[in-house]
Amino acid sequence: MKLPYLLPLLAVAAAHAEEKTDLATADAYRPQYDFSPPPVITPQTPFGQPLENQFDYQRPWVNPSVAQNVSTNTTRPLQIEASIGNLGDQERLLYRQRGSNLYGAVQAYRLHLDDYKDGSGQRVHAGYTRDGEMAMLGFVPDARQEYRLGVVRDHIADDKQPQHQMDAVKTQRIVVNANARLGAQDQSNTINLTARHIELDRTANNYKLRTTAPNSPRVKMEVERSKTDLNADYRIQYGEQRSHIGLQYGRDSHNAERFALTPQGARRNAYRFADIHSDHYHLYYDHYWNLTPEHQISGGLSYDRLTADVKKKNTPSKIGEQNFPAPNQLWQQYYGRALNGKRTTSGVGAALAYEFRPSERQKYRIGVDSRIRQPENPERFTSLPGQNGMGWIGNPHLKPERHNHISLAATWQGTGWRDYGKVRNGDLAGAWQIEAAADYDKVHDFITYDRARGQNGIHKNDGNIISRNVDATLIGAEIGAAKSLSTNLAARSKIRYQYGENDSDNRALYHVRPLTADIALDWRDYAPFGSYNLGVNLHYAHKNSRRDSNKTTGLGLDYPTAGYATVNLYGSLQTRDRFAITLGVNNLFNRRYFAYNEQPHTAAINPNPVAAPERSVWLGFNYNF
């Protein structure tokens, strides 16, 4: 299944292929509102940048930094990185080595985020402590074989969640990843094999990191998940055509239980996920055809099948003389149907794209696809009874989404463009680039969270969270431009817009990004000691005038936010590609603002608004030897 935040590749060696594979994948689309831990930290994760804050906006690009000359220098195997600021600190030790037949890497890291104040001086009880290790070993016996094995341990402790009713006091993941390439290194006649296993252990409660109100119950949630993915694909090139065929299998076991603390100890009062065992099969075929050097078409077909067995769906909970309904009883009450036996959903996907490159400075692409998205466990198997709109009852009878999607993209470059901030052959006037993209997605059976109000197919009217299939429209557009103003000074900008509509209920979709704009100005130059750069960026977000904020007519997830603008400063210097210092100031003018939050590990179904941090200063360094 998907879970890109849960199951990242150990991206240490180069990817096996440049071409995108599985063009008609069922994993292309994510839920409108997602729940998953943050990405695992790999050697490619930027350090020395500001410490991640869950409640600030995500940048549209990585700020340029000459410190990358140090962090990407592989001629010296050992690297130490650290940063500190008024929000917290982070440290990493990374060792990389490559020989004629062997290559490997190990790393250890720690991150700590403190409570902080927002721009008005109000304290926000957020923060976490995170640590982990990674080890990877690769073996290349000859040009036609490559094998790689990697292990990651990632642990997050005391993750305060002010937007949520509970705090994630423990999240631990163990990820084991194995890869094999058999055949040509350029993927012209090659078999690729991948095996990946993850163990997730998570505990959340409402009492360790916050004060529980008198007479309020003290509760905790314990989550265990085990997932194994096996993938095999074959890729072949003949003339100007390439084909990929692949088969994937996934096994997922997911159990989550809610407990109330009583004088007799912790007693279960509900299952969030009642021991779900899923088998996922995915078969795909892709084909690429270079008609001429300027024209390429590509297409793909896929078949996706997901079977889920909820082992404890008929197991009720009990505390003393108080009985709590089994998951199947809840599903019967809300949807009029219990889940008998296993639940299987399947679908076919198709994708077609045409790319036109009239010159090396222009590229145009149009793509159309019709793909499914399978329902995820929170959407269909959650079984948490509650009162006053605090219950959450998934819908086990959800259908897969059907996305009918068209996308357009174009890139134009001047004759002097080499990269951002770099000029080709001294052609300053031609050192520019424009990128634009737009997409339109008409979704049949879109899976939406909602509240029980006796809608068609809903048998309760108590305001608890439910899931439904509706029709929806999603539209997105963005345009970006970059220009070198001199051999040292460059500027760039990006504007992004999203639109979402629940067509069945004639209301705005929840959790849709408002109009945003980003502008940056960057200076880079050489000095006797090495090189340095300075930069400033402005981020603007429009007020969220389209939102789902009324719990009596919709989900009520969104809260009104005003438009805002914030300015960040940053810079770095490095000497001899060996030692670098980075520094910066975020939220320079100390504005209080609420950012659109697209990080799934902060998702809450009944969220409280959380402001971004006040003005923050950070200083980092890295050193390799």
Regions found by a protein language model. Give the residues of each.
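Gram-negative outer-membrane beta-barrel transporters
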Residues: 290-297, 306, 427, 433-443, ...
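Signature of Gram-negative outer-membrane beta-barrel scaffolds
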Residues: 245-247, 251-363, 367, 374-375, ...
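Transmembrane beta-strands of outer-membrane beta-barrel pores
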Residues: 82-86, 99-101, 110-114, 151-157, ...
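Outer-membrane beta-barrel domain signature, especially the mid-to-C-terminal portions
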Residues: 122-125, 164-167, 203-208, 258, ...
